[in-house]
């Protein structure tokens, strides 16, 4: 039993009655039986795997931009290096030492998870012939790609 990856087009961003940003998702394709994909990724699929990359489809090929994960990793590493956790949650009556220790462990764990997700995504992209490109390259591809290129955002979901 392999992992089935579903690619959805994201469109029509709007705010719902509770003030949350929501969008319309239309399934446009899937990649079946990705059995070589890392089993451990199952744990991270429900915690934002899809938000890790933006996808586009051009001339029969998928392209991916991992900007969100890369930026989050850089920001987390910078936060750990500077030891500045001031924007993170502080429990009531928590002294500075406990606060810093707890948040340092949290950031270290987050960095490990992000590195794992980036590595897993890269392996998935390689196995499925999805090229990783920058935002600028994606914009240029869409602009110059003609009718077979879609400029919408795509996201991945998965089922086992």
Where are these regions (language model features)?
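Acidic (Asp/Glu-rich) sequence patches and key acidic residues
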Residues: 1-160
């Amino acid at each position: 039993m392999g992992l089935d990856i579903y690619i959805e087009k994201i469109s029509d961003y709007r705010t719902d009655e509770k003030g949350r940003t929501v969008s319309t998702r239309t399934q446009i394709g899937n990649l079946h039986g990705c059995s070589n994909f890392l089993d451990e990724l199952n744990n991270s699929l429900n915690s934002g795997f899809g938000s890790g990359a933006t996808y586009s489809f051009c001339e029969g090929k998928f392209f991916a931009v991992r900007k969100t994960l890369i930026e989050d990793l850089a920001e987390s590493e910078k936060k750990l290096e500077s030891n500045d956790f001031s924007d993170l949650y502080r429990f009531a009556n928590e002294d500075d030492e406990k606060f810093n220790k707890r948040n340092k462990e949290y950031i270290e764990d987050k960095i490990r998870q992000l590195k794992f997700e980036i590595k897993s995504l890269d392996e998935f992209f390689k196995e499925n012939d999805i090229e990783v490109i920058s935002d600028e390259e994606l914009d240029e591809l869409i602009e110059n790609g003609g009718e077979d290129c879609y400029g919408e955002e795509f996201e991945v979901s998965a089922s086992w």
